[in-house]
């Protein structure tokens, strides 16, 4: 580490204010931080890094935080159920910004081959510890680390507490910051913001009792700093689905399930991955009779009535929860049955006009699934982190490290090098990764 400093909005650029947490935000109060890592191939010297790149990143982040000020906030966590949690911005609030240098092998880090994720954690920051006061706790929700790989490239690691942002909101921020950085020397850099974020919680129409219910439930559990422990028993591997492979996969599924006329790339890949992962596990016959669950995030912004603005910044996620008997999932028809179940569950969820009427059942339903055999996905087929160009072109590699803290999970985003392709990353114990890699290498004919 070369330096740790603070970066905030410029003085007097943001009014002191508070933003309440909705029940959508409170869902994540006890969840570990989201950890994103972007590697950029940009050979530069230490001098150019310290005299040009770092100042530009700081200046552009400062200007971006004017528009995304909740990232600079403290989250206020009262001790009493009578007071609600909120993001509070006071003049001078800022985020932790770490500058580091590494002699690690850059080319090795950006490869898709299996590797231990442990060393990747050297390049993401930790959120500052929780501050305890007599009647409340305070904690910061965002931190940045920039790492130089001399002569090879730059890494940007980000830790975000999930209460402040879901994946669509994070993508809006990273797109805005990278664009601001790329155009920082232009006088009209503000024009690079496609649309400014909306923080007004009243744009989501729901019974306010949900906030009280979720808050009282959150207070039942101790608030702890939750940086994921180092996943020493894990292997991470990235699997790329090119457009032609996706087309072949969809055709294979549709040939066996003709009713799936409008089969999405997401459903096809999700079914293939879910069946493959489950087959990779050894299980006794009793477990084969149990249900297996697949937890899929669903962005509710366009699906509520009235719709929530696309540029709403915060959390606005529900979920789909397909379930199958494990023995069916690992059987010969596993992928086809999984595609049917996933497609039906997502369709039911996104077309449910009364989805918010079931909010009180969400947490118990998810907790039940987490006690069983479950698989989850972070990201989506629309997520394009590679598009975040700070002036050095597309990222060479992106990693969502948060899945290392999950039992069995995958990340999904647009592929870097293949138009229409998608990239899946898995984090698994080595024996299970070896079994899945064998399944994947067989292809859809295996």
From Swiss-Prot:
Expression sites by tissue: Detected in the young leaves of perilla red forma.
InterPro entries: CAT-like_dom_sf, Plant_metabolite_acyltrans
Family classification: Belongs to the plant acyltransferase family.
Gene3D superfamilies cross-referenced by the UniProt entry: Chloramphenicol acetyltransferase-like domain
Keyword annotations: Acyltransferase, Transferase
Single annotated GO MF: anthocyanidin 3-O-glucoside 6''-O-acyltransferase activity
Catalytic activity line of the entry: an anthocyanidin 3-O-beta-D-glucoside + (E)-4-coumaroyl-CoA = an anthocyanidin 3-O-[6-O-(4-hydroxycinnamoyl)-beta-D-glucoside] + CoA + H(+)
Active site: residue positions: 162, 389
Listed EC numbers: 2.3.1.215
GO-annotated biological processes: anthocyanin-containing compound biosynthetic process
Provenance organism: Perilla frutescens
Functional description taken from the UniProt entry: Catalyzes the transfer of the p-coumaric and caffeic acids from their CoA esters to the 3-glucosyl moiety of a range of anthocyanidin 3-O-glucosides, 3,5-di-O-glucosides and cyanidin 3-rutinoside. Anthocyanins are ubiquitous colored pigments that are responsible for petal color. Does not act on delphinidin 3,3',7-tri-O-glucoside. Recombinant enzyme can use caffeoyl-CoA but not malonyl-CoA as alternative acyl donor.
Keyword Transferase part of the UniProt annotation: yes
Any Pfam family: Transferase
Pathway annotation: Pigment biosynthesis; anthocyanin biosynthesis
Keyword Transferase: yes
Name by which UniProt lists this protein: Anthocyanidin 3-O-glucoside 6''-O-acyltransferase
